[in-house]
A protein has these predicted regions:
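Active-site loop/turn elements of alpha/beta-hydrolase fold enzymes
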Residues: 79, 100-102
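Phosphate-binding glycine-rich loop
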Residues: 26-73, 87-89, 97-99, 121
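N-terminal "arm"/small-domain region of PLP-dependent enzymes with the aminotransferase-like
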Residues: 1-26, 31
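Active-site phosphate-binding strand-loop segment of PLP-dependent enzymes
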Residues: 103-134
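Conserved coil-to-alpha-helix start sites within the AMP-binding
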Residues: 80-85
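Structured binding elements
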Residues: 92
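A short beta-strand submotif of the Rossmann-like class I SAM-dependent methyltransferase core
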Residues: 51, 76, 128-131
């Protein structure tokens, strides 16, 4: 089975926008960043948006915002980029994995349900579950 890592759709317009920034005086933190954040707010009807350099950073910030800390548990898929687990470790939490559905390579709903029932009996529910979608 080949699991696709990503399905990028990079247009000529995207490439031109990147080249424009690379040729400007701002490689980082230039006017394109707040413009992007504002457009994201408008698109999502959110009051605020913060652009970060990677999904790793975004997941870490999300865990902090949700109060993940030492003693907490985060569950994710074993078929993922390491950031899905590392974000918990950065916060001092424990990582555990939920089995996948072999037909989809995604987190199995049945495995998640069974694991939740067992965790509830033990009084050790996860604070965060990060599913991974390909």
């Amino acid at each position: 089975m080949i699991i696709p890592y990503g399905k990028q759709d990079i247009t000529k317009k995207d490439i031109e926008a990147v080249v424009k920034v690379l040729r400007s005086s701002f490689l980082t933190q230039g006017p394109s960043v707040p413009a992007f954040e504002q457009k994201l707010c408008e698109y999502t009807s959110a009051k605020y948006a913060v652009a970060v350099n990677s999904c790793t950073s975004a997941l870490h910030i999300a865990c902090i915002a949700l109060g993940l800390k030492h003693g907490d548990i985060l569950w994710t898929s074993p078929i993922t980029f390491v950031a899905s687990a590392n974000c918990a470790l950065y916060c001092g939490a424990t990582v555990d994995f939920v089995d996948i559905d072999p037909g989809t390579a995604l987190m199995s709903v049945e495995s998640l349900s069974d694991k939740l029932k067992k965790a509830e009996k033990k009084g050790r529910l996860p604070k965060i579950v990060i599913p991974v979608h390909f």
